[in-house]
Amino acid sequence: MAAEGAAVRDETGRTYAAAAVALPSLQMSALHLAVAMAASSGAATLEAAALVSDGPGPNADDLAAVRDLGPAAVVFHAAPDGTLLATLRA
């Protein structure tokens, strides 16, 4: 699995950051974990999400997780050097 980090911003401006988890019994993408952290903290909606990865951009499941809390959220995908690779709609 490619190393990755993600962050999401909720409607109040709070930011939740996460890194991918790859344990034998638990695997979660950075974007999934950031959305889960926002949801468990009581966020009502998401305004934006960002994924930094040396691998491919967010997959359909990542985008669906963002869409669950932020149907209009913009998702940015960047390389580790900060180069913006894609701007997507959840």
Give the label of every model feature segment.
Residues 19-22, 54:
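Conserved short-loop catalytic and cofactor-binding motifs
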Residues 23-37:
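A short, polar/charged loop-to-alpha-helix boundary motif
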Residues 41-90:
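C-terminal binding/interaction regions
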Residues 10:
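Short, acidic, Ser/Thr-enriched surface-loop or helix-capping motifs
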Residues 17-19, 81:
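Terminal helix-to-tail segments of small alpha-helical proteins
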Residues 1-4:
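Short, small/polar residue-rich loop motifs at catalytic or cofactor-binding pockets
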